[in-house]
């Protein structure tokens, strides 16, 4: 692996290898008063974010620092991008100052792959490109699932919400079906994109339902997605109240889930919209477990790209 741009670039063995590596990092750090490993000492990592982020950016920064790398954060709003500098010139500048890896988030689909083409010898990690891909989110979601409910093969994962604008949904569909899960998307018709049947590892390996209540009782995982109003131009549903009634995870719906099933959300959560306030804090909700797994998964990705077989 030279870059991590899309889940589609990984085979099953590589996916499981990253998940296993993440678990090893979790074990290595468990019980340590000082969470510091020498793994990436002397390496320089840049985070280059053209969109806002809390979880992903802080998670990558923590992952790099826990492995003793120098991590430098670049925000588009406070860099020469604000003066009109192109993405290519920004990327070449970071390479020239010694970047071993660039972790980037960009509003345009395909931006990370383009940068990887320009900087072949610098590791590029896609932290989200438009509505296209978010590979480390899918890896941490799968790691969280496996740690809570066991092997993913044969499990039913119901992903509910704004599928149209969700890079998380796309990446999860590819990863989970590669590992043998059944993936069901639930959303209003206006938030289901064309070509969704091709999102899985094989044609027609995912399906769409418009009835949340008919899918929840036998689900092993219910993953709620935020309505991305910032990417919407025009009305996609009549009202927030109607959306919450038909597609929100209410207390009543959560109570219909089978024993041992878990609730996930990539964040940020809109409490009262796609998820009930109390459900968001319920024991079966593993949002904070996802955040914790995110650090270990991103440590695994950085280690694999920057050390690999050297380690």
UniProtKB/Swiss-Prot annotation:
It is an enzyme of class 2 (transferase). Carbamoyl phosphate binds at residues 55-56, 105, 134, 137, 267-268. Its EC number is 2.1.3.2. It comes from the Bacteria. GO terms for biological process: 'de novo' pyrimidine nucleobase biosynthetic process; 'de novo' UMP biosynthetic process; amino acid metabolic process. It catalyses: carbamoyl phosphate + L-aspartate = N-carbamoyl-L-aspartate + phosphate + H(+). Transmembrane segments: none annotated. The keyword Cytoplasm does not apply. Keywords: Pyrimidine biosynthesis, Transferase. GO terms for molecular function: amino acid binding; aspartate carbamoyltransferase activity. L-aspartate binds at residues 83, 167, 226. Belongs to the aspartate/ornithine carbamoyltransferase superfamily. ATCase family. Heterododecamer (2C3:3R2) of six catalytic PyrB chains organized as two trimers (C3), and six regulatory PyrI chains organized as three dimers (R2). Catalyzes the condensation of carbamoyl phosphate and aspartate to form carbamoyl aspartate and inorganic phosphate, the committed step in the de novo pyrimidine nucleotide biosynthesis pathway. This is Aspartate carbamoyltransferase catalytic subunit. It comes from Corynebacterium jeikeium (strain K411). The lineage of its organism: Bacteria, Bacillati, Actinomycetota, Actinomycetes, Mycobacteriales. The gene is pyrB.
